[in-house]
């Protein structure tokens, strides 16, 4: 009965125009140059368009890679309600590791204080996995069945059941400039666009691919996801205006424009949302102005999956307990193509930057603990072909205690790299689609959208995009999660939970 009442409550919140409208008053503190803290109150209306029956298109750059092919296979298998059998029995596709699929949050309390929780996707009217249509590009020509077979992620029984569907998915030719990925990747390249020495034609080709995909599948909205190999860092942040960036693409004499920016520009010009799930600095500041011009979003960077996600928990735990981390050393080795690409220094540097930055906000928030110091923070990644996708991660947290005592946490983490990443890709798709339907009415009646970087999605990224205004981003795991949970609550008129719960403490 309580479940039925809750569902009925949510249905009542949509108006005649299928807009969920909720007024919200929020307070925050600001400190001025005289170190005086002032409380500021703002009142807004949050407007959420109801989820329609339209399908959502997802176009993956690097669809034949481990993440792209496995996500596609998982979605197809889920849509077909397939199961598979191995020595442990019969299994169904469940997307364990997905916040969208399994994340719940407290929405109310019983009289005895026991929490009543709901799945996040049931609080807001979110898209279903059945609503997704997948396509994309790759610089390798193999159909997705052959790619999945080569990648060795799926159980063979499940792969056989998906064979016909996966064989029908052929990657579109991809944008390839050999200077931006590791030299050990070039021998496999056999499916590229043929616009020699003209990068603007590559942009136009990407636009054409997106529009054709929309037309062929009767789609209105597309999310474009970079899931390709890590590129070396680019120097395109020097362009303060997007007009200068576009001009350089049209006349790239110095070869400074990487493939990922070509896709980002093409996505923006079709009003598609662009997501960068790799470490490189694709989303340069001028692209935010460009995305705003086209009323779309540009989101990233680098999926936060295993070792780094755990670091965002443990480093916060130590500092929040008054324990001072002196050094954090992270070593890992893996044998998939991601590891192979990261063997070269330019590509590794992109990854190192995103992994190291994950503790910055924790240091900033604990000045008394760290003073002017920072923990020694080292990252090591090695390619070991024999272990394949079964990544080994070893972390040591060396910390200082009372009376100069020392504490060491040593963690050995063995995980399937792709099977951690794919459910997070699903999360990004689903929450990005939801947030694209939300606008805000300010006190002056102006209607605005989220900032172009969609920073509430920082929960899913190692190096969350700060946007044009260089928004301060929290990396600490539970701060990010509470922000996501509480925002979804206020959209549907449910009070946020600050865990003070004075009604039970007084």
Predicted features by range, described:
Residues 10-278, 282-293, 307-314, 413-506:
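Metallocofactor- and cofactor-centric catalytic cores in central/energy metabolism, strongly enriched
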Residues 272, 296, 323:
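Short glycine/serine/threonine/alanine-rich loop segments
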């Amino acid at each position: 009965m309580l479940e039925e009442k809750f569902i009925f409550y949510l249905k009542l919140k949509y108006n005649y125009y299928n807009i969920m409208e909720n007024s919200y008053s929020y307070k925050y503190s600001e400190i001025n140059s005289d170190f005086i803290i002032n409380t500021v109150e703002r009142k807004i209306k949050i407007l959420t368009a109801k989820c329609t029956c339209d399908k959502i298109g997802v176009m993956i750059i690097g669809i034949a890679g481990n993440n792209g092919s496995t996500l596609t296979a998982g979605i197809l298998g889920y849509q077909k309600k397939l199961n598979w059998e191995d020595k442990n029995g019969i299994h169904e596709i469940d997307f364990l590791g997905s916040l969208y699929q399994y994340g719940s949050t407290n929405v109310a309390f019983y009289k005895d204080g026991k929490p009543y929780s709901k799945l996040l996707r049931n609080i807001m009217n979110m898209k279903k996995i059945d609503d997704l249509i997948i396509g994309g590009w790759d610089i390798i020509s193999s159909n997705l069945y052959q790619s999945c077979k080569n990648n060795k992620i799926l159980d063979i029984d499940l792969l056989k059941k998906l064979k016909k569907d996966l064989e029908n998915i052929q990657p579109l030719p991809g944008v390839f400039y050999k200077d931006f990925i590791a030299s050990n990747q070039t021998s496999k390249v056999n499916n590229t666009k043929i616009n020699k020495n003209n990068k603007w034609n590559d942009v136009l080709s990407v636009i054409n691919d997106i529009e054709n995909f929309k037309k062929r599948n009767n789609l209105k909205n597309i999310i474009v996801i970079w899931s390709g190999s890590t590129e070396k860092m680019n120097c395109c942040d020097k362009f303060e205006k997007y007009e200068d960036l576009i001009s350089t693409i049209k006349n790239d004499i110095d070869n400074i424009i990487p493939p990922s920016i070509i896709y980002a520009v093409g996505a923006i010009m079709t009003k598609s949302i662009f997501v960068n799930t790799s470490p490189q600095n694709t989303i340069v500041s001028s692209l935010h102005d460009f995305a705003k011009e086209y009323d779309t979003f540009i989101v990233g960077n680098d999926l936060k999956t295993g070792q780094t996600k755990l670091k965002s928990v443990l480093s916060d735990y130590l500092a929040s307990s008054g324990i001072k981390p002196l050094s954090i050393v992270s070593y890992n080795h893996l044998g998939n193509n991601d590891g192979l690409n990261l063997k070269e220094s330019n590509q590794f540097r992109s990854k190192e930057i995103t992994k190291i930055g994950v503790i910055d906000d924790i240091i900033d928030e604990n000045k008394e603990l760290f003073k002017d110091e920072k923990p020694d923070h080292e990252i090591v990644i090695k390619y070991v072909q024999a272990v394949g996708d079964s990544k080994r991660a070893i972390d040591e947290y060396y910390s200082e205690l009372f009376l100069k005592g020392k504490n060491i946490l040593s963690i050995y983490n063995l995980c399937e790299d792709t099977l951690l990443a794919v459910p997070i890709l699903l999360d990004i798709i689903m929450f990005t689609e939801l947030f694209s339907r939300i606008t805000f009415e300010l006190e002056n009646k102006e209607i605005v959208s989220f900032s172009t970087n969609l920073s509430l999605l920082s929960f899913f990224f190692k190096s969350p995009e700060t946007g044009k205004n260089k928004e301060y981003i929290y990396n600490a795991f539970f701060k990010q999660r509470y922000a996501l949970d509480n925002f979804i609550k206020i959209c549907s008129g449910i009070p946020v939970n600050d865990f003070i719960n004075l009604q039970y403490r007084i």
